[in-house]
Amino acid sequence: FRAFIEMLRANFAHAGGLRIDHVMGLQRLWVIPLGATPADGAYLYYPVEDLLRLLALESLRHRAIVLGEDLGTVPEGLRDKLSERAILGMRILLFEQDYGARFRPVLEWPDTALATTSTHDLPTLNGWWHERDIDWNAQLGLVDADTEDHWRDNRAHERNGLHHALSLDPQNFQEEATGADQVLNASARFLGHTHAPLVLLPVEDALGVLEQANLPGTVGTH
């Protein structure tokens, strides 16, 4: 494990915290043989318990926090393993909803994960509210007309769902306030009222930027 330990120490030497992108990679990685299709791939498994113990040890030695980006296809039990070692996960406001566009109430957010409005791979909160991500996908031909219409109908329900979740705290958000600026401000305060031990507000959402930094699945067109 020397290379892994040296990598951790090199990073901790210059920062008080470390964010591990796709932390699921400590447990398994989907690999595809050269020239093959994704259907020919398989999971390559790693000694996750040993890696997490080393990660916890080095973070303690350097008095640093560790964040694990646990979004996407998360192996069963991994989040429990992370929380047992005080490694924070990540919860994204736009993702914290069920299929009925019911957003997670403020007091139901976990205390084992960082809370944030969005990420560089997702629309900004302002862009999400104005459907800019849908605009881009339609403009680039990544979705057909039927999918676009369904997406926009669903987004309208999501906006109503977020609006309702924010309005449950009358001191935070007034029911009649529907402008994007009010939603941005209320969303930031909402996350601050959760149990999350750390809240991250991306600069794009702090400034109300409309366009997202990266549109996954595109190269040179966004």
Task: Identify the residue ranges that each predicted region occupies.
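Catalytic cores of glycan-processing enzymes that make or break glycosidic bonds
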Residues: 1-222
